[in-house]
A protein has these predicted regions:
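Juxtamembrane helix-loop-helix connectors linking adjacent transmembrane helices
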Residues: 36, 63-131, 229-230
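Alpha-helical transmembrane segments in multi-pass membrane proteins
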Residues: 9-61, 109, 113-114
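Hydrophobic alpha-helical transmembrane segments
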Residues: 14-15, 75-80, 121-125, 154-159, ...
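Membrane-interface helix/loop boundary segments of multi-pass membrane proteins
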Residues: 134-159, 200-204
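Small-polar-interrupted transmembrane alpha-helices in polytopic inner-membrane proteins
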Residues: 156-169
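Juxtamembrane "helix-exit" motif on the non-cytosolic side of transmembrane helices
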Residues: 25-33, 96-99, 169-174
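Short, Lys/Arg-rich, polar N-terminal cytosolic tail immediately upstream
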Residues: 1-7
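Functionally important transmembrane alpha-helices
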Residues: 158, 178-230
């Protein structure tokens, strides 16, 4: 492989994740756009940054297709893990709601993003299914499976989870006490490592997507409770 092309591919992926993650967290923390107006912009960049990579370097097109190659192998483990994560997240909420103040969550969602009890169901559906798929394509497909061809595997394993956590910082700031926020971010990094491990064996994004959906279903169930819908 041409050394310059190899270097450029590596830099493109790394810079794409860094710039996008920092931009999203900055906008969420300081601009506070309405959630529904932010959706099309995020979709555009979630898709455009990876797709531009595969258009520039067409020899990598087979890599792109492999990210979506469906295999039954490993799906059962992903489903079982997803159910376990669902139980842990929901159980953790019920165990800690007397200790941790969750009242700032709905207030922050409403004031910062315009999410209310009236529109939360649509937000929950989008986050659980569509947004989780886009995040898996960007952070685990493009940011891990594709990246690890050009960097040390250990670096690839930790790079995308750290950026995945940074990407969430702007949205979570103000919802929780700093210590709780730090714990959540640590959980996002650990979750990213688990997602990478699931996808590493099969080379596609479906295992982590199923598990990610289960985690989001649990988080959104908590959201329904906090908004008084359940």
């Amino acid at each position: 492989m041409n050394i310059m092309a190899y270097r450029n591919k590596k830099l493109y992926i790394i810079l794409s994740l860094i710039v996008f993650s920092l931009a999203v967290t900055f906008i969420d923390a300081f601009v506070h756009p309405p959630y529904f107006s932010k959706i099309p912009i995020k979709i555009l960049f979630f898709l455009a940054l990876p797709m531009l990579f595969f258009v520039i370097w067409r020899e990598e097109w087979s890599e792109f297709k492999s990210l979506f190659r469906f295999q039954k192998k490993g799906l059962l483990i992903s489903l079982l893990l997803g159910l376990a994560i669902f139980g842990v997240i929901l159980g953790g909420y019920f165990a800690l709601r007397g200790v941790i103040d969750f009242s700032g969550v709905t207030a922050s969602l409403t004031s910062g993003m315009g999410i209310t009890a009236d529109n939360f169901v649509w937000v929950a559906i989008y986050i659980s299914i569509m947004n989780s798929f886009l995040e898996e394509f960007f952070f685990r497909g493009f940011g891990f499976i594709t990246l690890k061809k050009y960097v040390n595997v250990k670096f690839a394993y930790f790079f995308s989870p750290v950026l995945f956590a940074i990407y969430h910082v702007g949205m979570l700031v103000g919802m929780f006490h700093p210590a709780v926020l730090a714990l959540i971010l640590f959980g996002l990094i650990v979750g990213g490592l688990i997602f990478n491990a699931l996808n590493d064996k099969l080379g596609n994004i479906y295992p982590s997507w199923l598990t990610h959906m289960a985690a989001n279903f649990a988080i959104n169930t908590i959201g329904f409770i906090l908004f008084g819908i359940l």
